């Protein structure tokens, strides 16, 4: 199996945060005291085109490309009907490739990821990940999400070192690891194997921050990559 070795878009900042917040804005009559949540969206389907994302019938995100992740947007806490269509399509005409009712609680931070495949038997699989790290002023926190639908369970290790995460299956997100600040080189191995199948380019981790690394795309089709993101 030969995953591509490029890092993809490190973080796709699409200028959509303002649009997302505006589309879900708290009505003026409600008032600023209402509780809010923070939400971002990741496109992890390697054979899917850019997509538009709707919530409760309003377009929130336009032309989100594969291997891109938005900034967090602050939205009113509550339940939303999330629908995803190919870029330029409408929810009335479709095709709607994801339709899910999601609840974003007061004070929460959430990443919503599209994973899986558009053409294959697995289909498109939405993933919902709570982003609630605990501050680590001296070091950093790092976790990993295995969102590559056709990859086996994996271990993650410093290059040439012992695994720090073991037997992580598809759809799983690890706990945060406490690590020292600074650059780190990591590799992905098949669970239980000493051989690397993918080397993550150097991550420069700054003290006091928390990060997620998302493995996305298709391992077999060569769209596998890892997208790092700051869990602000």
Question: Predicted regions: what is each one?
Answer:
Residues 31-232:
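Intrinsically disordered, low-complexity polar regions and short flexible loop motifs
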Residues 22-30:
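C-terminal segment of classical bacterial N-terminal signal peptides
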Residues 3-16:
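Bacterial N-terminal signal peptides that target proteins for export
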Residues 1-6, 29-33:
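Basic/polar N-terminal segments that are highly enriched at the extreme N-terminus
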């Amino acid at each position: 199996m030969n995953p591509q070795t490029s890092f993809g878009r490190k973080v796709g900042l699409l200028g959509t945060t303002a649009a997302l917040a505006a589309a879900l804005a708290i009505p003026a009559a409600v008032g600023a005291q209402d509780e809010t949540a923070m939400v971002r969206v990741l496109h992890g389907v390697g054979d899917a085109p850019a997509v538009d994302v709707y919530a409760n019938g309003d377009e929130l995100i336009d032309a989100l490309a594969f291997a891109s992740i938005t900034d967090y947007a602050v939205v009113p806490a509550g339940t939303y009907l999330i629908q995803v269509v190919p870029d330029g399509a409408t929810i009335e005409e479709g095709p709607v490739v994801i339709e899910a009712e999601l609840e974003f609680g007061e004070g929460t931070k959430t990443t919503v990821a599209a994973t899986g495949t558009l053409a294959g038997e697995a289909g498109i699989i939405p993933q919902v990940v709570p982003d609630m790290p605990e501050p680590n002023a001296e070091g950093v926190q790092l976790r990993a999400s295995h969102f590559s639908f056709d990859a086996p369970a994996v271990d993650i290790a410093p290059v040439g070192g012992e695994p720090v995460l073991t037997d992580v299956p598809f759809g799983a997100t690890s706990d945060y690891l406490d690590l020292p600040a600074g650059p780190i080189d990591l590799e992905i191995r098949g669970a239980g194997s000493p051989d690397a199948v993918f080397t993550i380019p150097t991550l420069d981790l700054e003290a006091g921050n928390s990060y997620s690394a998302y493995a996305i795309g298709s391992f077999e089709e060569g769209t596998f990559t890892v997208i790092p993101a700051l869990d602000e």
